[in-house]
Amino acid sequence: MPHAASGSRACKGKSHVHDAGTKFGMNDQASRIVIVGAGLAGLACARVLAAAGKQFTLLEASNAVGGRVRTDVVDGFLLDRGFQVFLPAYPEARRVLDYDELDLRPIYRGADVFVKNRFHRMADPLAHPLTAMKNFRDEIVTLRDKWTTLLLRKEVFGLQEPPRDLGDTESEDYLRDFGFSEVMIDRFFRPFFGGIFLEKDLRTSAAMLHFLFAMFDRGGSALPAHGMQSIPNQLAVALPPGSLRLNAPVSGVRAGEVTLDSGEVLHADHVIIAVSEEVAHRLLPQTGAPAPLPSRSTTSLYFATDDLPPGDPILHLDGDGRGPVNSVTVLSRISPHYAPPGQHLISTAIIGSPCSTELEQVVREQMRRWFGETVVAKWRHLRTYQIRHAQPEGRQLKLGAGPLNAMIEPGLYRCGDWCEDVSINGALLSGRRAGEAVMRALGEPSPD
């Protein structure tokens, strides 16, 4: 993967870290707790332990915190590793994050959907009533579909977590049974939620559709002003001095013991695995868990331009399914900090990881259909990201049984979005639950 944006505008705040080559500090010699992985789940777990005054060592294989939530700086542009947005209504995020410090910048509630050679504005009628009224009879969707959308808003009102009573119902089946037309599913739900689920067949559990629809309905979507990595950075700033070790990859884990790639062995009474499902399976072969399904992947191409027509901070969707680009967003319209003064940053998001050597040209061809030759000719390609392990597959399909237990066996714990639900909220919640499980094992109440 590309280099991290250490010390950049994307990395506000200063966390207390040790390089892997640094020997244990005062925390490390006394520590009885080791957390492997400083993504959102590991940081949320560390937050619980730090609030309780517990000493721990947090190991991170890479050179910065965040896991899959990372931001690079390229020529002054902030490039999130894969197109991501933040949902301010997430209950666990509201619990642990300082939104004012993140300086959240809202995204337009709705989308411009490209169908029949032009964009059609689908606006949230509650947030943008005049625009919704103006486009009330737009042929992109039927009046019945618009009414059914209001019924779905009522159905999910008040949800705080994915409902567990939908069993293994897939999202597409649920939408069809709820009364949406094939046109509405194909033109809006497939590109919009397909871009979130990273699969256009909408096989993902309808429970996640319910939960995310409720979150969008309640709080819309946004970006931190200085990039998505502002989220893990904010959590890392509160870590105790000497508790975080970067560039410290782990090769093996068992109850009471963590082995680093360097050969160093850390002993602890409590070990928390806060890594991806694939890495957890590799580190814990002794559990006998079945191999995880292949991960879902995504590709993002970033472009820069200094000449762009005025517009709203809105998501542009591929409603006709001709692809390969599923969505386009001008990130600098959402937050000007994403680009140097006088320039714009454009994100194009693709579901999957195509291996074509001509991918940029294929993307440009599609963008010319969308925005015109004159506009796209001025775009400069900055970087392409292929995120092959963007989301775990299995957890997306089956949510009815509830979250996985944090404790694997006495002294050994797990957390991550693959243990809860695949979202920022799920990662934060799973990390907190792992921290609370450690506190229970210690016979002490969790701080909050």
Language-model segments: which ranges?
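Mobile amphipathic helical/loop "lid" adjacent to a hydrophobic cofactor/ligand pocket
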Residues: K23, A93-R94, D98, D103-L202, ...
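N-terminal Rossmann-like FAD-binding beta1-loop-alpha1 element of flavoenzymes
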Residues: S31-L58
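Glycine-rich FAD pyrophosphate-binding loop
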Residues: A50-V74
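Glycine-rich active-site loop/strand segments that organize a redox cofactor
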Residues: V69-P88, K146, L150-P162
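Short beta-strand to alpha-helix junction loop
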Residues: Q84-P91, L166-G167, F178, A214-A236, ...
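Helical element adjacent to the flavin cofactor pocket in flavoenzyme catalytic cores
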Residues: L209-E257, L266-H270
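Mid-domain catalytic core of redox enzymes
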Residues: S251-Q361, E365-W370
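Conserved flavin/dinucleotide-binding core of flavoenzymes
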Residues: L331, S335-D448
